[in-house]
Amino acid sequence: MFSPLIDQLINSLRHLPGVGPKSAQRMALHLLERDREGAQNLSEVLAKAVEHVHRCQQCRTLTEQALCNICSNARRNRKELCIVETPADVIAIETSAVFSGYYFVLLGRLSPIDGIGPKEIGMDVLASRFAEGEIEEVIIATNPTIEGEATAHYISERAKAQGIKVSRIAHGIPIGGELEYVDGGTLAHAISRRQEI
């Protein structure tokens, strides 16, 4: 519709979650018409992030160092491990300020139909952490979806086999909801009222 380069920019912006064709077009035109300096800055920062941000070696969240700020913090409770689906879930729980343990990011959830099995969500790495014997409680904070519940059950069985106490965050979170969209108060209540499973 526009020039090939503008069309390419619009299509690239459509890859962002929640951005449809109209929003992508508005963003592209705004950056090109009214905020070229902002567009240049966005381009530079995005290129740096793509080059330097990678997965934490211990919890698999996003970081610029080998270990993220949480995993490298010796003051956190090493006996508690909260298991989440995405780095956005770590941010959501950290914002609630009610959890002081460590995290493990699955980077998804079990979904055999989509070809996502235990290996794809890092169960081999997680099983190794369980076997180390340092973790006393696992708090499962997967989303309350069918796949999230199946993933929680699978992880629960593996942790219990190692003698680890397992709890699931309480359901103050709406069924079918995503953790990154839940307000801090609701999330704080859900974590503080977690239940053993």
UniProtKB/Swiss-Prot annotation:
Keywords (A to Z) from UniProt: DNA damage, DNA recombination, DNA repair, Metal-binding, Zinc, Zinc-finger
Top-rank lineage group of the source organism: Bacteria
* Signal peptide coordinates: none
Zinc fingers (C4-type): give the ranges: 56-71
One Pfam family cited in the UniProt record for this chain: RecR_ZnF
As one GO molecular function, the record gives:
zinc ion binding
Tell me where in this chain the Toprim domain is found.
79-174
Q: Which GO terms are recorded in the biological process aspect for this UniProt protein?
A: DNA recombination; DNA repair
| Keyword Ligase found | no
Q: Write out the function statement from the record.
A: May play a role in DNA repair. It seems to be involved in an RecBC-independent recombinational process of DNA repair. It may act with RecF and RecO.
Q: Which family does it belong to?
A: Belongs to the RecR family.
Supply the name of the protein.
Recombination protein RecR
